[in-house]
Amino acid sequence: MGRWALDVAFVWKAALTLGLVLLYYCFSIGITFYNKWLTKSFHFPLFMTMLHLAVIFLFSALSRALVQCSSHKARVVLSWTDYLRRVAPTALATALDVGLSNWSFLYITVSLYTMTKSSAVLFILIFSLIFKLEELRAALVLVVLLIAGGLFMFTYKSTQFNVEGFALVLGASFIGGIRWTLTQILLQKADLGLQNPIDTMFHLQPLMFLGLFPLFAIFEGLHLSTSEKIFRFQDTGLLLWVLGSLLLGGILAFGLGFSEFLLVSRTSSLTLSIAGIFKEVCTLLLAAHLLGDQISLLNWLGFALCLSGISLHVALKALHSRGDGGPKPLKSLGSSADLELLLRSSQQEEEDGEEEYFVTQGQQ
């Protein structure tokens, strides 16, 4: 009887983990292909990003309100001094990372985007060393060389290479290194009370919106104001279709963050990191099959080399956590650039009842 109960518990945990991974894949891969699909007909990626930020903020505010009503505990609200001095740098870096990434979809393929964004780990490591969040070790040098070499091989003589798009997404990856380093520093400041990812998203989105607005005004403002798809529309049906498509992207973006939180809170950040590695493979295969992206043997070898560097980094983090007696929250940087805000170790017991309520609500 006891053996049977253990088998059932194992199967249930495995099924739950698989389900959460698939949910994460749906949102993560879905938003990548959504961005590419929408930018083919809607050439305003910065406006699209700003709309997504607004939707994420509204969902975050709604989630905070539901949790507060259920727990009767006030959620954290930062003072203006802390908000502008300590949160603003992270918000600005995040806005530029996301904005430039979405902008690049106007020019490059999904496969080149996926590969280049995978190199964000390279910049995260570099800035972690600069900010003394990591110690320089021979293994880290090997990780950097593998990822950099893989990126070079993937872009070398690529038939669908675009310099402008590659520069945008590489710049986004570089800023992403700053972004995740600042995020780690921000979330480790316990006095701010932003350990809960919903509170973090709630506070970041307004500053991200304001940080992205100047770029939008310069590069898209005039064109958008004269576009028949939004402000000078003549077909109400077309306007509703555009607004609905933009709303869908915001829902996918919030769902991605929420699915990451569920996966980490019910398993571990290591599970999310490993799932992120296989997600990159799935994305490239789908891009080649659905969009006709041309990937040569040399490109695949470069991608494999880059993934080996990322896998080595994840393995080193896992061994380091085990050596310290267990995983520590916010010390492990994932393999994808879209992970960091929601990384929390499931092995740290949640002290607040409202957080448990929020996770339970997300599973219904």
Swiss-Prot record:
Positions bearing Phosphoserine: 335-336
Keyword field contains Cell inner membrane: no
Entry keyword Membrane: yes
Assigned keywords, A-Z: Glycoprotein, Golgi apparatus, Membrane, Phosphoprotein, Transmembrane, Transmembrane helix, Transport
Record's GO cellular component terms: cis-Golgi network; endoplasmic reticulum-Golgi intermediate compartment; endoplasmic reticulum-Golgi intermediate compartment membrane; nucleoplasm
Membrane topology summary: Multi-pass membrane protein
Principal localisation: Golgi
Entry's Gene Ontology BP terms: fucosylation; negative regulation of gene expression; positive regulation of Notch signaling pathway; protein O-linked fucosylation
Top-level taxonomic group: Eukaryota
Membrane-spanning parts: 14-34, 42-62, 104-124, 136-156, 166-186, 202-222, 238-258, 272-292, 295-315
Compartments, as annotated in UniProt: Golgi apparatus, cis-Golgi network membrane; Endoplasmic reticulum-Golgi intermediate compartment membrane
Its job: May play an important role in the cellular response to tissue hypoxia. May be either a GDP-fucose transporter that competes with SLC35C1 for GDP-fucose, or a factor that otherwise enhances the fucosylation of Notch and is required for optimal Notch signaling in mammalian cells.
UniProt cross-references to PANTHER family, sorted A to Z: SOLUTE CARRIER FAMILY 35
Family, per entry: Belongs to the TPT transporter family. SLC35C subfamily.
Protein name per UniProt: Solute carrier family 35 member C2
Gene that encodes the chain: Slc35c2
